[in-house]
Amino acid sequence: MAAGAGVLGLGLGAFAATKPGDAAKGKDVFDGTCAACHNADSTDPKVGPGLKGVFKKAAMGNKKKATDASVLEIINKGSGGNMPPLADQLTDQEKVDVIAYLKTL
């Protein structure tokens, strides 16, 4: 399955025109938007958890398995802690690209 294709398959109307995720573009978005609070190269926390291997873990800090849908929900709504909702700050394509990048960690 192409990275990001799971998001497309969720029936989320907003993502109907979104292309499969591009991990290289997702890294650029991560570096500009997420890296201030999240480590990509370790599981050590900054303000938020380190995200290395997040899609390989049995569960994230919220006790949910990292899936395209669960990560997209956190990106859009925030985590209820320090993570702000980014639904209006990132385009749908940027979100899919970040998810593709996170899968490479």
Model-derived regions: residue spans:
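Extracytoplasmic electron-transfer domains, predominantly the class I c-type cytochrome c fold
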Residues: 36, 45-46, 53-105
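Residue-level recognition of conserved structural "scaffold" positions that shape functional pockets
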Residues: 11-16, 33, 55, 85
